[in-house]
Each structure stands twice: as C-alpha cells, then as structure tokens.
C-alpha cells in the first residue's frame, strides 16, 4: 500500500531513516545529523521552563538540536549572525560572483570533500586577490566573503562558491579606489584564472598522493584516466556568474544569512512523501 500526505523533513526521517540506515550504512556524521533532525524539539535535548511572574503559569518548551543541518533550527541563528555582521559591511556597491567547477570533477570532489572544498576557497580567493591587485583591472586590495554551497536547485550534488565582492578596495597608499559603478573584473578572465588555480591544486594533491578515490571516482587512481580527466576539464569553459545584486549593505548581509544558515533539505521542498509498507 502506498500512502501520500503532507509532511515535514522530521516526519520523513522518522518514517524512513531506520530502514535507510540498515541498507546503506551511512558514516557517523550522517547518523549524528539524522539523530538531531529526528529528535529536534522533542525533549531529547532538554527543555526550557518559563514561569509567569504575575500568575505563576508554567510553560515548558522543548530545546532545539542546534544542528546546522536541521531545517527547523536556523532562523534564530541566522538573525543573530546577520546582526553580528552589520559592523563588517560597508555602505558601498557589492557584487555576487559564483565560482563553479565542471560536473566531471564531482565524484573526485565528493571522495575528498575537505581537501577539495578547501581548494575551492583557495582558488577563488587567489583569483580575486591576484586580479584585483593588477593595475589593469583595479590595482587595489579588495574585501569579499566566500560561502560554500554543495547542492544545486534540484538538490543534486553541485559544489560551488558564492562570493560577495566589495566594489572597490584600498590602493598601496590605503586610499579607496573603485571603477565608478561597474564591476572591475572581466568574467572570462575570472573563469580562466580560477580554472588554472583550481586545477593546479588538484594536480598537486594527486602528485602528493593525498587524494582518495571511492565509488565512481575509483577509476581516477589510474594515472592515464586522471590525465584524461584533467584534459577534459582544461578544454571546458568554466562558468563564472557575476552580477551586482544588492541595494546597500543591509541587503548584502540578509542575502548572506540566507546562504550561511540554510541546507538543501528545507521543508518546503519536501511537501509530500510516499510511504510503502513492506
């Protein structure tokens, strides 16, 4: 029998996670996250007790799990983070720059998440710093914030970096310098430089035997297959998105809060679920 009804992410985990775990043996950090989601605001993480000073009425509130991966826990931390960031954002133009890698790299990145996510940050930062300091483009030290996203709009695996870039910077004399309202870096140049820097990090990790290969990435243990992968990625035009999307500092930090306190499994994306009894 198949039953369909509206549900939350917590409902889905409560109904299906136990059988999923038996079939798939997920790693410890996945099991921990599942436990947090299933037990959030159930009393498993303790309670808060409030007593009215006037009438003595007692209210008991179950604590949240406070896991970053729990879609029920992020609204308050998001607002708290936004408030803390207000002092770090200038009243100046900001630009949204997204650094994306080809899908061909997904399996090897998934097998080496810590190393190759770090490489994404390194390559994006080095690209922005190098080009911004070039007098041909700006000739200044810029400010930016990088945020890693690991999923796409279809909730597929899609690692990429969102970067909020200040539309100007400080020159060698610590004086403000900008380009008068337009973004100072050509999109095509950003893509090519980022591609070169990320691929250099990937090759360096391979040469130092620091990469692991699991699942569909196992074939890249072979040096010939790995070189084929590199060649294919060098031939591609890496997609870089650049656009001024903000109207003032407050819009910037609100946007950042949405990305730093959000995961793929938000409840509104999972309105209905099918339950099959076996």
Q: What do the predicted segments below correspond to?
A:
Residues 1-272:
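Beta->alpha loop/short-helix hinge microenvironment recognizer with preference
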